[in-house]
Amino acid sequence: SVIKVPLKKLKSIRQAMKEKGLLEEFLKTHKYDPAQRYRIGDISVALEPMAYLEAAYFGEISIGTPPQNFLVL
């Protein structure tokens, strides 16, 4: 079965950080390395915070009993 999740458009993380004057410092300290997710021999999961800076659509889902709500990109 397919469940449709209504999406909400919000400001992107990049735009919100820019408005608060935080973006420039963040970009200096968090370099984006697209090759990082392809490392071999590293069993840890590579988090790519840069990939989510442009995300502007969110949906709310509920999991469990009693339901717990989560926002997902």
Curated annotation (Swiss-Prot):
Q: Which UniProt keywords apply?
A: Aspartyl protease, Digestion, Hydrolase, Protease, Secreted, Zymogen
What InterPro entries does the entry give?
Aspartic_peptidase_N, PEPTIDASE_A1, Peptidase_aspartic_dom_sf
The record's EC number reads 3.4.23.3
Subcellular compartments: Secreted
Q: Which reaction does it catalyse?
A: More restricted specificity than pepsin A, but shows preferential cleavage at Tyr-|-Xaa bonds. High activity on hemoglobin
Give the SUPFAM superfamilies listed for this entry: Acid proteases
Its Gene Ontology cellular component terms are:
extracellular region
Enzyme class per UniProt: hydrolase
Limits of the Peptidase A1 domain: 57-73
Cite a single GO MF annotation.
aspartic-type endopeptidase activity
Q: By what name is this protein known? A: Gastricsin
